[in-house]
Swiss-Prot record:
Region (Disordered): 808-1096
Principal location: cytoplasm
Alphabetic keyword roster: Coiled coil, Cytoplasm, Initiation factor, Protein biosynthesis, RNA-binding
Cellular localisation: Cytoplasm
GO molecular function: mRNA binding; translation initiation factor activity
GO cellular component entries: eukaryotic 43S preinitiation complex; eukaryotic 48S preinitiation complex; eukaryotic translation initiation factor 3 complex, eIF3e; eukaryotic translation initiation factor 3 complex, eIF3m; multi-eIF complex
Comp. bias regions, Basic and acidic residues: 808-852, 878-890, 933-942, 955-973, 1085-1096
Protein's GO biological process: formation of cytoplasmic translation initiation complex; translation reinitiation
Protein name, UniProt field: Eukaryotic translation initiation factor 3 subunit A
Record domain PCI: where: 323-502
Family, similarity comment: Belongs to the eIF-3 subunit A family.
Organism: Brugia malayi (Filarial nematode worm)
A Pfam family per the record: PCI
Length: 1096
């Protein structure tokens, strides 16, 4: 079980040594592994290297490749920036130990087999049975038992190290060194499968290097040193493939070498050394020879000879002779038709694939075109290779390419091949059999030109290379490949040349000259033809001399007969010739005209196609330019993004999140992250911290809730005590306050009376009156002029506003325009009437008001609370009422009369005084014309029914329905009480008294139903908070009295949680009724009082 606590590296190493000393190597390995894998190690020390060396020893001894891989990857992350030499030391030590263990296992396996072989007694029955079943030797079985596990471990070690070091520039040399050791391992132990996998891994690593060239730490393909290392490694890979005779893998390795050479050549042509090319062509020639491709084998040797000659400044004669002889023999060994597609390729109709393969192989040889046998021979002749080669090779070249002696050719070639064999050169002897086949093919082709039929025995004498069966198989093969057209006749024991049937002839034939090969042989054939022609001419001359007379007589008769025939047909022939000439001329004219028309059409079609091609080319170039521009912009954007990401990552390294990520995941994980990933990691960490903080807060909140609840319980006791104390002291405070208020009111009244008396004296003074009159007269003209100007400007602005509003609004009908005009005229008329009414009210205002004698008229619990003057609610729209309020405020306060200075009714109208004698003061102003008259009229009607708050009483009919019976019973009314209409009563009724009416508005009907009064508390009550006074209906800071709780407004509907101002009417007998409130609202209001006791 690995420890779950952190250990220092020195402690872990000491602990591992202790465990090893007691034989617990696995526990020691786990201890060291946990120490290396710990994320708390951020700085490399020398102790870490000692831990890794011991860790590698334990992994090798216990055969734990996966643990070694994990530890090496972690150690690479720890050391790749500071101690890369330490990483190399650990890896080399690890591979050395694995190799030693493998070699020891191999020796152990061999020794065990030798011990078994040395025993005198017979084999055990199980060994005999196993050998009979498997067919393997004892050494093979022992290797599988003892050596195979260590071979597998060593292979895993090489592969893991290569994966660890791939695509990293700082350990590139170590990577290639391990790759070459891997090739040696595969060659030494003949691990063919592992060699293929190793080659595939190296190709995959190269692909990844090409893909990630934009990164900073990767291997750069622009580096000369890197390309040289890769090229040398690929050449060793090719050598190993040839050594292990894996020819398919050798061909793929040759492609890899060619690709690396092309990369090096693109970087610098001088980077690839000529010796590398010589080695490359030598190995490639061997691969082609093993593949049976003699044409490209000879081409590779020729390329090697050319480069070798240019490379060697002092090209010795022996080296030149050796290279030239090999090239010459390889070229002569090329069979006829080697550059043509095979029969299978022709039958499957895949000639294009054959051409593509030829082009690919030519690219491997760095040839612009595919090589041919004739082209190679011309190049050999140009380089004068036959003269440089050995004598036997030069003779073979002359016999095969220059002479025409099919009957003697085989014996001559056999003699020269014997000389070549006597040279005892393996690279020469490999061409002997191929040269025999080429010689036999050439003899058969030459014989087929001269003879039609030849006996099989004669052919066996001419071609001594094969016996009967081999010769017959050879003839069938060359006939199948259509080198010659031959048919074997076993009955007659002969061979017939030439196709017996046209259907048996192939769809193509080689040229006749292909049977002879060179120009010298063609000259020999011409000599034979000239000899036969001269013999024919001589024989013909001898016949003419012997039969001269007979020939002369026959010639004379023929001449006479031809003359007669000519004379007979002369005229007809002449006419026929003339007619034919005319036809020919007509045909020529017609054909020329048609040819001209066709030429013109062809020219027009060519011009059209050329124009179309140019247009397509222009479109293609434009598209390419667009794509290139798009790619350029994309590359620029990617570069900008990369720089921005790099800058962000650089800034992030200065933040605490960098330390947190490195602490948790390591430096390598941070290097592989982008800014978005870092921000996402930071956001996740913040979310985690927020969740932890929220959990702690929730835990504290639970504790805090209990504490607050305890506070509240104690607070309730303290508040009850304060409330009881306040209830005891409230009457005393009220009496003292009332006493001070009465005294202050008396003093204010006395001062006001004194002022009034002084003003009366001034008013009665004739000098003052004369002065006021003179000032009025002096300013009368200016005053009247300003009044008239103001009126004119007002009318003009009003008309302009009406016209402007008319144009802005959608055009309505003519009736609406007329209605607007009428509203303007009506508004003007109302203004005039308002001025007249104001003058009348000023003249009819009483001198003083009656003073309330005592406070017993107020039935409210507040004692001496003053009733306020009722206000008549207007049914006009809100906009008009707002304008009226502005005008009313601008008009100024009314001068207080003597009656206004009383202590109880100052500024108010008493409820007990009837108002029949004096008209109600109306503060209404004429309405301002509105653009939405209909809508505001509806709103005004709604206001007239809901604007009963703030100490106002709504005008309602006396006949409207009253509250229901259960509501009366709930409020303490008798269950059988009858509802009656309210009568005009000047004094308060008994129903108005009682503590349950606290803060409610009381409305009583007067003689006129439009005049009502409302009770209110005094304006000044310092011992009550303003909030409670406002809630109970008392005026605050001059505001009208009324029951207005929090949340209610003057224009809101009369339903809701806080609208508890109710209208109550009663008669003289104490019958009580409630209007406009439901039972549910009463219950909810009572509950609100109970719930909000702390607010009050």
């Amino acid at each position: 079980m690995p420890p779950n606590f952190f250990q220092k590296p020195e402690t872990a190493l000491k602990r591992a040594h202790e465990l090893i000393s007691v034989g617990k190597e696995m526990d020691a390995l786990e201890t060291l592994h946990d120490t290396i894998k710990s994320k708390r190690h951020k700085q490399w020390t020398k102790t870490h290297e000692a831990i890794m060396l011991k860790h590698m020893e334990l992994c090798v001894s216990l055969r734990r490749p996966h643990m070694a891989k994990d530890a090496l990857f972690q150690y690479k992350t720890l050391t790749q920036q500071v101690a890369i030499k330490s990483l190399e030391t650990v890896i080399q030590r690890f591979l050395e130990l694995a190799q030693q263990k493998t070699e020891e296992a191999q020796k152990t396996s061999i020794e065990k087999v030798e011990e078994i072989d040395d025993l005198d007694q017979a084999d055990a029955p199980e060994n005999l049975l196993l050998s009979a079943v498997s067919g393997d030797a004892a050494q093979d079985r022992m290797d599988r038992t003892v050596l195979s596990p260590w071979l597998r471990f060593l292979w895993d070690s090489y592969r893991n190290c290569l994966d660890l070091l791939r695509n990293t520039a700082v350990v590139e040399q170590l990577y290639h060194r391990i790759a070459r050791q891997s090739f040696e391992f595969c060659a030494k132990y003949q691990r063919r499968t592992e060699f293929r996998k190793l080659c595939d891994n190296l190709r995959l690593h190269l692909t990844q290097i090409q893909k990630h060239q934009h990164l900073a730490h990767v291997v750069k393909l622009t580096s000369a040193e890197s390309l040289t290392l890769m090229q040398d490694t690929r050449l060793i890979q090719l050598d190993t493939a040839i050594q292990m005779e894996l020819w398919q893998e050798a061909y793929r390795s040759a492609e890899d070498v060619h690709g690396m050479m092309q990369l090096s050549k693109d970087k610098d042509e001088r980077m690839v050394k000529p010796a590398s090319y010589v080695n490359y062509y030598d190995k490639l020639a061997l691969v082609f020879w093993k593949a049976g491709n003699r044409l490209f084998h000879a081409a590779a040797l020729l390329q090697k000879y050319i480069i070798y000659k240019d490379m060697k400044k002092t090209f010795s004669m022996e080296e030149a002779m050796d290279q030239a002889t090999r090239v010459l023999l390889a070229t002569l060994a090329i069979p006829d038709g080697a550059d043509n597609p095979s029969d299978l390729t022709r039958h499957l109709d895949i000639e294009e694939q054959h051409i593509a393969n030829m082009r690919l192989l030519s690219n491997l040889l760095r040839l612009p075109v595919a090589p041919t046998r004739a082209g190679i021979l011309k190049e050999i002749t140009r380089l004068n290779l036959p003269d440089v080669a050995v004598e036997s090779a030069r003779t073979l070249y002359r016999l095969l390419e220059c002479n025409f002696a099919p009957l003697r050719l085989a014996s001559q070639i056999q003699a020269e091949l014997t000389k070549v064999t006597e040279l005892n050169r393996a690279e020469y002897n490999q061409y002997v059999e191929a040269l025999k086949g080429v010689t036999a093919t050439k003899i058969i082709k030459q014989i087929s030109v001269i003879y039609d039929t030849l006996s099989i025995g004669r052919i066996q004498k001419v071609i001594p290379f094969y016996n009967g069966d081999e010769l017959e198989r050879f003839l069938v093969d060359i006939a199948k490949h259509r080198y010659v057209k031959a048919r074997i006749d076993h009955r007659g024991g002969s061979i017939h040349f030439g196709a017996a049937d046209a259907a048996l002839s192939g769809f193509f034939d080689l040229e006749v000259s292909d049977g002879f090969g060179g120009e010298a042989e063609q000259v020999a054939v011409e000599d034979i033809r000239n000899h036969l022609q001269s013999m024919y001419n001589n024989l013909r001359d001898a016949v003419q001399v012997l039969d001269y007379e007979k020939i002369k007589r026959a010639a004379t008769d023929d001449l006479k007969r031809h003359a007669e025939i000519y004379l007979y047909h002369k005229d007809a022939d002449y006419e026929r010739i003339l007619l034919r000439r005319k036809k020919i001329e007509s045909y020529k004219e017609t054909s020329e005209r048609q040819k001209l028309e066709k030429c013109q059409q062809a020219q027009a079609e060519a011009n059209r196609k050329e124009e179309q091609r140019r247009a397509e080319e222009m479109r293609r170039l434009e598209q390419e330019n667009i794509e290139k521009e798009k790619l350029r912009r994309l590359a620029e954007q990617e570069e900008i993004d990369r720089k921005v990401r790099a800058e962000k990552m650089k800034k992030i390294q200065a933040t605490p999140i960098y330390q947190a990520i490195v602490k948790d995941h390591g430096e390598e994980a941070f290097q592989n992250m982008d800014p978005d990933s870092v921000l996402r990691e930071q956001r996740d960490r913040l979310d985690e911290q927020r969740r932890e903080q929220q959990a702690r807060l929730q835990q504290q909140e639970k504790k805090f809730d209990h504490l607050i609840r305890a506070y509240h319980l104690q607070e309730m006791v303290a508040r009850k005590a304060i409330s009881d104390n306040f209830a005891v002291k409230a009457p005393q405070n009220h009496d003292s306050y009332e006493k001070r208020r009465v005294e202050n009111a008396i003093k204010d009244h006395e001062n006001a009376v004194a002022v009034y008396e002084r003003m009366q004296k001034v008013r009665k003074d004739p000098d003052a009156a004369a002065f006021l009159e003179s000032v009025k007269k002096a300013r009368a003209d200016d005053f009247n002029k300003k009044i008239r100007g103001f009126g004119r400007r007002n009318c003009v602005m009003r008309n302009e506003n009406v016209l402007k509003n008319r144009h802005e609004l959608p055009k309505e009908g003519a009736e609406e325009r007329m209605a607007s005009a009428r509203e303007v005229a009506e508004q003007t008329r109302r203004d005039e009437q308002e001025k007249e009414r104001r003058a009348v009210r000023e003249s009819q205002r009483p001198s003083k008001r009656e003073i309330v004698e005592n406070s017993e008229m107020d039935s409210d619990w507040r004692k001496s609370a003053q009733p306020t003057q009722p206000r008549t609610i207007s049914s006009k729209p809100f906009g008009e009422r707002f304008v009226e309020g502005e005008r009313y405020r601008e008009s100024g306060a009314v001068t207080a009369s003597e009656a206004d200075s009383g202590p109880w009714v100052r500024g108010n109208v008493t409820g007990s005084q009837r108002q029949q004698d004096v008209p109600i003061r109306n503060i209404e102003r004429p309405a301002v014309p509105s653009r939405f008259s209909n809508r505001e009229q509806a709103r005004g009607e709604a206001d007239s029914t809901t604007n009963w708050r703030k100490g106002q009483v709504a005008q309602r009919d006396r006949d409207q329905s009253v509250g229901k019976q259960p509501l009366m019973e709930k409020r303490g009314e008798p269950s059988g009480a009858q509802l009656h209409d309210v009568k005009a009563v000047a004094t308060p009724s008994p129903a108005d008294a009682g503590p349950w009416r606290r803060g409610m508005i009381v409305a009583r009907d007067q003689a006129d139903s439009s005049q009502r009064t409302s009770a209110a508390t005094p304006t000044t009550q310092p011992w009550r908070p303003s909030r409670l006074r406002q809630a109970d209906g008392a005026p605050v800071n001059g505001a009208p009295s009324g029951r207005i709780l929090e949340g209610s407004g003057s224009n809101e509907p009369s339903i809701g949680k806080w609208n508890r101002s109710i209208q109550r009417t009663g008669d003289s007998h104490g019958a009580q009724s409630f209007r406009g409130i439901s039972q549910h609202q009463q219950r909810r209001g009572a509950a609100d009082d109970d719930r909000n006791w702390r607010q009050k």
